[in-house]
Amino acid sequence: MAKLLVKQVRSKINCPLSQKRGLEALGLRKLGQVVEHESNPAILGMINKVKHLVSVEEAK
């Protein structure tokens, strides 16, 4: 499976609780933080839920 780099680019202030929990589940706590995840359906679903708050790139 491919590796994904997920970076939080927007604040979670004024977001619904489910989106805040999605960011925490991805391991994103601070603005500008980058985490690496395996590409699987669970992770892709979480990313889709908060796609307006994060940027996603494929890791090299």
From Swiss-Prot:
The record's section on Pfam families has:
Ribosomal_L30
Q: Is the tRNA processing keyword given for this protein?
A: no
What InterPro entries does this protein's entry cite?
Ribo_uL30_ferredoxin-like_sf, Ribosomal_uL30_bac-type, Ribosomal_uL30_ferredoxin-like
- One GO CC term of this entry? cytosolic large ribosomal subunit
Source superkingdom: Bacteria
Q: Which UniProt keywords apply?
A: Ribonucleoprotein, Ribosomal protein
Kindly list the biological process annotations in GO that this record carries.
translation
According to the UniProt entry, its GO molecular function terms are: structural constituent of ribosome
Q: How does it assemble?
A: Part of the 50S ribosomal subunit.
The record's listing under PANTHER family reads: LARGE RIBOSOMAL SUBUNIT PROTEIN UL30M (PTHR15892:SF2), MITOCHONDRIAL RIBOSOMAL PROTEIN L30 (PTHR15892)
Q: Which HAMAP family match?
A: Ribosomal_uL30_B
The UniProt family comment states: Belongs to the universal ribosomal protein uL30 family.
Task: Tell me what this protein is called.
Answer: Large ribosomal subunit protein uL30
Q: What species was this sequence derived from?
A: Flavobacterium johnsoniae (strain ATCC 17061 / DSM 2064 / JCM 8514 / BCRC 14874 / CCUG 350202 / NBRC 14942 / NCIMB 11054 / UW101)
Q: What is the lineage of its organism?
A: Bacteria, Pseudomonadati, Bacteroidota, Flavobacteriia, Flavobacteriales
